[in-house]
């Protein structure tokens, strides 16, 4: 409510956080479009630049048969597709537009939920959603959000995701003329990878 939950005991890739969120909100599933947003240049000028989704596009995306070249790397129906066009290849349900309208017109509803977990499309995604659904709540002119994350990389992924969804709360609050409230993070399978152990030991010795 009175601060922003950005980790301070290690570096946070803030530009990547902002770029990925804008990419999701745009509804894109092309990794090269994310690169354009992140690096601020046209895709034919940044063919050597990588994003956090490049490896998924080059491996799982290729294995699924999606277009993959220097200027386009498709990932299948990942987050942006589910957020902005759920259910159909073209003209599906725009969950972002709907939830903004619902928050504005019926703020007390308990149905302010956006889901990326489309069971029918999971096997078509280069990476099934780790942060699967989020719910908004309005009270006392404040907008709060709870995220459920099915799979949580506690060292790298979770600080990134917390910052991303907290930024989303700030964006929605501005649109709806509300104040940012609380962000609540909930994890299912929470893990630290073996190759992160030493870094985690070092990080927990630091003071925020």
Regions inferred by a protein language model and the residue ranges of each:
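Terminal, non-catalytic protein-protein interaction segments that mediate quaternary/complex assembly
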Residues: 1-208
